[in-house]
Regions:
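Outer-membrane beta-barrel channel domains
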Residues: 2-167
Length: 167
């Protein structure tokens, strides 16, 4: 099937991206790794639809490679099936950094399609603070209706006890 990947600048600082029948054939393959632990491996995202403006979806300053609670990890989307389509809006609107997208994947026999959505907004509070929120809906495999909402506050000072950095 033919696929489509299109990007449009809605404003100079806000972009919309559409993908249909995505096969991500241009994505670099991961090296094979044997995981003998009971914990999931967090490999970096390589698909362009998800890597473009990926920093806008970061939560609480957490790195995806760290085995901690990460509310959104795009590598799970489309693992067991293809992605039928996706729409993403990302950029800044005034002082607010924002990112939102919805992706549709083939579902099960009782639910022919499954959708997953993520929305994230953050605003800087001066030079050293940032306040944000995230909301997700759905599961990457379409097997449930799970919602998550969270808020985060980041504080960073480069003048903590002299010249040390405090986060």
């Amino acid at each position: 099937e033919p696929s489509l990947y299109a990007s449009l600048s809605v404003t100079p600082r806000l972009n919309a991206t559409l993908t249909l029948n995505s096969d991500f054939a241009d994505a670099v393959l991961d090296a094979r790794v044997v995981n003998l632990s009971r914990f999931e491996l967090f490999k970096p995202e390589r698909r362009s639809f998800f890597t473009q403006d990926a920093g806008r979806f970061g939560f609480g300053g957490l790195e995806v490679e760290e085995p901690v609670l990460v509310p959104f990890f795009s590598r799970r989307i489309g693992l067991g099936s293809s992605i039928d389509g996706g729409l993403k809006l990302s950029g800044t609107a005034g002082p607010i950094d924002l990112g939102a997208f919805v992706v549709q994947v083939p579902g099960r026999s009782d639910a022919p399609v499954a959708r997953m959505g993520v929305a994230r907004a953050a605003i800087g509070l001066g030079e050293s603070q940032r306040l944000g929120m995230i909301a997700t809906q759905g599961t990457p495999d379409g097997l449930g209706r799970i919602q998550l909402a969270g808020m985060d506050h980041q504080f960073r000072s480069t003048r903590f006890m002299g010249e040390r950095t405090f986060e």
